[in-house]
């Protein structure tokens, strides 16, 4: 196969790397030689010091000789240190030059790759011409002319185009197809994986970014690594590449790179600040690594270090994390300079048009720059347009997206069989289930708030899992492990029957649960039964996680069970050595359960994978599982049926139906419904129930296809035998089965007499009631009460009441002295003072009001009472003004007042700065008659290459119109302005980028205004000096023009 011309540059960079390495080795050898020489010199000096002096006359001569030798050695050592320091400096310079050369080469490729991109996309479908109108503008300009010459190009242009096509044909650009895997890939790639590699190569050669969305378990990691291996082997491109993935999968990425392509040098960029500093300085150096593997959090924290590099490929695993374009992660990833972006996801694209646009915008921001245009293009205007929308979606996604299912490509992979195993409740579970429904009877009967119903649902699901999840349910202390751990939960009884059968046939088991505390119970059970196990949950560290996976997967491992939390253990883990998956409870989102199942059902699996989904019969879990199946059925219709509006959360009616489901059966009996059936019989019944549910879902899918594309259609509403359950009188069910709680009876004394009974009936004399102690109201510092004085009055009142009560208790006793006087009651004046002090404070102001007041002060300044009052709910302007006055005088009474005042002053400084900016812009614009056309900015050295003068002029004028800080409005103004309709660079800028450019322009304007003011002052000063130099001429002129008689007359008047 012919190599690309770029390979020469890559090989030259390899030679340069080798030279740098050789120089580094020489430097290290020289350092060792110097160390050895200095060490030997020291030994000689020490030996000379220790040698005895035999002749007293010869000693001074030897001393002089040694002094000269020491000076000479010191001079040599000094020169060597200087030389080594210079070598270190040269080494750093070489590394920096290498980094700059590497970045320049990547940037040059980045500029070249876009040339054929639109052409390639337009070959796929003409739809991209709609999104990339700007690229067509140039061709329209070329087509200007008259008559038959309107659409012709010149002969030179035609020849140049032919030459380019010939060159592409000779070099095979864009036509590479590998028949065998790269030789540096260890192991054997499957046919569909090689096809996936060829698809990635085609994207690379056409300058296109893509989404690899194969189903989980098909080897997306291997396909990605093989692409980097292809670049290394056939193109001579060693990187640098960056892989950004969830923290839990970094260990797997490093292992897979070492396993499949050990020639690629991978660096794991993770750890505490000290470890990261070491990696930055010693490992993350140009020429020393090919792949940087890091987490989402590290990419954000260490973005400065990572931005030093221009990357060949940025690969994002679990790419659905960037579907929100406004998230910090998505913004950070857009900052990195890269030739190509590859997104990897195992979950299907959700049927949300905006999230789909966000991914496409990340891949091709210059083409998919406008979400509004994208939404308009796929807007469904009528029932007949549905098929057209589906076709448009398919055409847009085809060049970027590759998604294949196991059933389509991996014929040799054993099938996966799912069985729902239903089990009853124990007596203890029924008691708790009934108590939970009775506790929130009003909400369950009438339908409360969604949040309240969701909480009830969660509690009921905990009860279905194990009653010991509730505080105080487990007998103890002391807590013991025994059969009660099994018999008190139906699912544990089922698990205890199932595991011995699986152990007999040499199966290995993964048990998933959403609840970490349930994993604790399962851990106790496994220890009780003597089963060896591993465990991973959200609190498991990275090293411990990798060690557990390795211990479970190693050949001959005796670990029988692997306990995993569904969320933490469902990503990036290969546990194909297991062949049974037990879902102890089901997630609301069925995709999460699928991810969990695919830990075992993946490439490398030799056995049929059995999935057992536990379900508590006649309880909320039946409805949860049913809903999950419905959602999976709908997900299959997402793109193929053009359904663009997704129901993401459970609505209130669904929750109510789930909570009520099975209530009648729970209340009708107290006894346990756990049967003694054999496990084989339970599995057979489960298979029947699963088949019935599959049939129901098939009918539901058929019904859903017939629905119109109408917002009012409820995809979760279908014909169901239990549809009328919401109409049951739930209150009646509870009252019919209600058992009054037993009354608390007084225990009988062991041997009681009639006299004692009679005495008891007569009763003891009533004790005097405890005095009602006045409770001091809770006084907060922000309410500005006189707390010190109120506390004094309160304590005085309490002392008097307690003293009075003590007197009453002791007045009938004998030989007991009366206590000393404890104080007097509050006087009328003190009572009035107390009431007045309570009214002086702001008792109606809550902590929330106080925080709102502080935020408003930061936003508007302490003096803008009207604006502050507009932010306060339930407070009049007069109340706010009164509070602001007291706050200004007594703010030092507040806890942490320094921080509060600093925040307010910082906000006021921002307001002041904003006013200064608006004045500076206004002053600048006042110097022009039409600033929208005439405004000029003195750039100096800050012109920049990205923004032109027309863009800067528009930006300044819009800030003057909209106000400083309204960046989203400024961004919208650029997007809607006809002036910039073809300027995709400006239209694709984020609000933060526009803000940074505005700040740069404002600094230039302020500097220009200062220079203008200085010139104005200088001009006024010169004018004033000129005026002061000319006045003497005016009187002389007037005096010369006056007649002698008028002069004589003025003299006469002055004498008078």
Swiss-Prot record:
Encoding gene (name): CHR11
Binding of ATP, residues: 214-221
Helicase C-terminal domain span: 494-645
One cellular component term from this protein's GO annotations in UniProt:
nucleus
SUPFAM superfamilies, per the entry: HAND domain of the nucleosome remodeling ATPase ISWI, Homeodomain-like, P-loop containing nucleoside triphosphate hydrolases
The record places the motif (DEAH box) at 317-320
Q: Which segments show compositional bias classed as Acidic residues?
A: 11-32, 60-73, 155-169, 815-833
Q: Where in the cell is it found?
A: Nucleus
Domain Helicase ATP-binding as annotated: residue spans: 201-366
| InterPro entries referenced in this protein's UniProt entry, alphabetically | Helicase_ATP-bd, Helicase_C-like, Homeodomain-like_sf, Isw1/2_DEXHc, ISWI_HAND-dom, ISWI_HAND-dom_sf, P-loop_NTPase, SANT/Myb
**Name of the protein in question:** ISWI chromatin-remodeling complex ATPase CHR11
E.C. code? 3.6.4.-
Domain (SANT): residue spans on this chain: 840-892, 941-1002
Alphabetically sorted, this entry's keywords are: ATP-binding, Chromatin regulator, Coiled coil, Flowering, Helicase, Hydrolase, Nucleotide-binding, Nucleus, Repeat
The organism's lineage is: Eukaryota, Viridiplantae, Streptophyta, Embryophyta, Tracheophyta
Q: How does it assemble?
A: Interacts with RLT1 and RLT2. Interacts (via C-terminus) with RLT1 (via the DDT domain), RLT2 (via the DDT domain), PTM (via the DDT domain) and DDR4 (via the DDT domain). Binds to FGT1.
Tissue-wise expression: Highly expressed in growing tissues such as inflorescence and flower meristems, young leaves and floral organs. Expressed in roots, rosette and cauline leaves, stems, flowers, inflorescences and siliques.
Other notes on this protein?
A: Plants silencing CHR11 display reduced plant height and small cotyledonary embryos with limited cell expansion. Plants silencing CHR11 specifically at the onset of female gametogenesis (megagametogenesis) have defective female gametophytes arrested before the completion of the mitotic haploid nuclear divisions.
């Amino acid at each position: 196969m012919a190599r690309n011309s770029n390979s020469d540059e890559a090989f030259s960079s390899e030679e340069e790397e080798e030279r740098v390495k050789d120089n580094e080795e020489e430097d290290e050898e020289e350092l060792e030689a110097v160390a050895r020489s200095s060490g030997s010199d020291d030994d000689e000096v020490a030996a000379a010091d220790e040698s005895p002096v035999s002749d007293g006359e010869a000693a001074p001569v030897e001393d002089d000789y040694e002094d000269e030798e020491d000076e000479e050695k010191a001079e040599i050592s000094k020169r060597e240190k200087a030389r080594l320091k210079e070598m270190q400096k040269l080494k750093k310079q070489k590394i920096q030059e290498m980094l700059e050369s590497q970045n320049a080469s990547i940037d040059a490729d980045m500029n070249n790759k876009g040339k054929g991109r639109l052409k390639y996309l337009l070959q796929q479908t003409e739809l991209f011409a709609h999104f990339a109108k700007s690229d067509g503008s140039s061709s329209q300009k070329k087509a200007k002319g008259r008559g038959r010459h309107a659409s012709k190009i010149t002969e030179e242009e035609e020849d140049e185009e032919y030459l380019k096509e010939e060159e592409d044909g000779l070099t095979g650009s864009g036509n590479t197809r590998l028949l065998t895997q790269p030789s540096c890939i260890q192991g054997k790639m499957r046919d569909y994986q090689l096809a996936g590699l060829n698809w990635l190569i085609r994207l690379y050669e056409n300058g296109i970014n893509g989404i690899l969305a194969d189903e989980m378990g098909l080897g997306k990691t291997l396909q990605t690594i093989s692409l980097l291996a292809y670049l290394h082997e056939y193109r001579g491109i060693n990187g640098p590449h960056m892989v950004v993935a969830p923290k839990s999968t970094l260990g797997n990425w490093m292992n897979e790179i070492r396993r499949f392509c050990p020639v690629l040098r991978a660096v794991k960029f993770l750890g505490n600040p000290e470890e990261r500093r070491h990696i930055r300085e010693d490992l993350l150096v140009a020429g020393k690594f090919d792949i940087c593997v890091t987490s989402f959090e590290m990419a954000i924290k260490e973005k400065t270090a990572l931005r030093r590099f221009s990357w060949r490929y940025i690969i994002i695993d679990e790419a659905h994390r960037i579907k929100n374009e406004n998230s910090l992660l998505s913004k950070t990833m857009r900052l990195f300079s890269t030739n190509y972006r590859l997104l990897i996801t195992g979950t299907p694209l959700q049927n949300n048009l905006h999230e789909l646009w966000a991914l496409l915008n990340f891949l091709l921001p210059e083409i998919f720059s406008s979400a509004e245009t994208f939404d308009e293009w796929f807007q469904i205007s009528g029932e007949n347009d549905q098929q057209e929308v589906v076709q448009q979606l398919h055409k847009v996604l085809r060049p970027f997206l590759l998604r294949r299912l196991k059933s389509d490509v991996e014929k040799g992979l054993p099938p996966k069989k799912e069985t729902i195993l239903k089990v009853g409740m124990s007596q203890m579970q029924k008691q708790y289930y009934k108590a939970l429904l009775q506790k929130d009877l009003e909400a369950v009967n009438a339908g409360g708030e969604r949040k309240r119903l969701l909480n009830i649902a969660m509690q009921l699901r905990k009860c279905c899992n194990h009653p010991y999840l509730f505080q105080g349910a487990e007998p103890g202390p002391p807590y013991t492990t025994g059969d009660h751990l099994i018999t008190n939960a139906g699912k544990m009884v089922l698990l205890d029957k199932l595991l011995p059968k699986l152990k007999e046939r040499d199966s290995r088991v993964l048990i998933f649960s959403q609840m970490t505390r349930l994993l604790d119970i399962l851990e106790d059970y496994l220890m009780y039964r003597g089963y060896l196990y591993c465990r991973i949950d959200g609190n498991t560290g990275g090293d411990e996680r990798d060690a557990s996976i390795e211990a479970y997967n190693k050949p001959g491992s005796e670990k029988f069970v692997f306990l995993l939390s569904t969320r933490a253990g469902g990503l990036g883990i290969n546990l194909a050595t297991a062949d049974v998956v037990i879902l102890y409870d089901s997630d609301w989102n069925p995709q999460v359960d699928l991810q969990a199942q695919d830990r075992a059902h993946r490439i490398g699996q030799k056995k049929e994978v059995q999935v057992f989904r536990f379900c508590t019969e006649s309880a909320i879990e039946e409805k949860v599982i049913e809903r999950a199946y419905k959602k999976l059925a709908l997900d299959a219709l997402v793109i193929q049926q053009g359904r663009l509006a997704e129901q993401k959360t459970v609505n209130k009616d669904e929750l109510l139906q789930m909570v009520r489901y099975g209530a009648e059966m729970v209340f009708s009996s107290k006894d346990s419904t756990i049967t003694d059936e054999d496990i084989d019989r339970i599995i057979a019944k489960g298979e029947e129930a699963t088949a019935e549910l599959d049939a129901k879902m098939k009918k539901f899918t058929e019904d859903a296809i017939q629905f119109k594309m109408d917002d009012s259609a409820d995809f979760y509403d279908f014909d169901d035998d239990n549809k009328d359950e919401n109409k049951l009188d739930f209150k009646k069910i509870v009252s019919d089965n209600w058992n009054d709680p037993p009354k608390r009876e007084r225990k009988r004394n062991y041997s009681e007499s009639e006299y004692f009974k009679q005495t008891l009936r007569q009763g003891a004399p009533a004790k005097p009631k405890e005095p009602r102690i006045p409770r001091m109201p809770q006084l907060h510092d922000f309410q500005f009460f006189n707390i010190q004085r109120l506390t004094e009055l309160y304590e005085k009142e309490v002392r008097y009441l307690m003293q009075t009560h003590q007197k009453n208790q002791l007045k009938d006793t004998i030989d007991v002295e009366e206590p000393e006087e404890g104080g007097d009651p509050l006087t009328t004046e003190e009572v009035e003072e107390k009431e007045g002090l309570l009214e002086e404070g702001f008792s109606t102001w809550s902590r929330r009001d106080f925080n709102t007041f502080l935020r408003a002060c930061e936003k508007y300044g302490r003096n803008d009472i009207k604006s502050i009052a507009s932010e306060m709910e339930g407070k009049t302007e007069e109340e706010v003004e009164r509070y602001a006055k007291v706050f200004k005088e007594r703010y030092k009474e507040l806890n942490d007042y320094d921080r509060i005042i600093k925040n307010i002053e910082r906000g006021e400084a921002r307001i002041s700065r904003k006013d200064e900016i608006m004045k500076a812009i206004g002053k600048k614009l006042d110097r022009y008659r039409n600033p929208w056309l005439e405004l000029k900015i003195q750039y100096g050295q800050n012109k920049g290459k990205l923004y032109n003068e027309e863009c800067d002029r528009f930006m300044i004028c819009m800030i003057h119109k909209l106000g400083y800080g309204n960046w989203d409005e400024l961004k919208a103004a650029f997007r809607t302005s006809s002036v910039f309709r073809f300027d995709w660079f400006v239209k694709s800028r984020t609000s933060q980028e526009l803000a940074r450019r505005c700040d740069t322009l404002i600094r230039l304007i302020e500097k220009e205004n200062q220079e203008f003011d200085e010139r104005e002052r200088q001009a006024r000063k010169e004018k004033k000096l000129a005026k002061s130099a000319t006045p003497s001429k005016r009187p002389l002129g007037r005096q010369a023009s006056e007649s002698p008689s008028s002069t004589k007359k003025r003299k006469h008047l002055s004498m008078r």
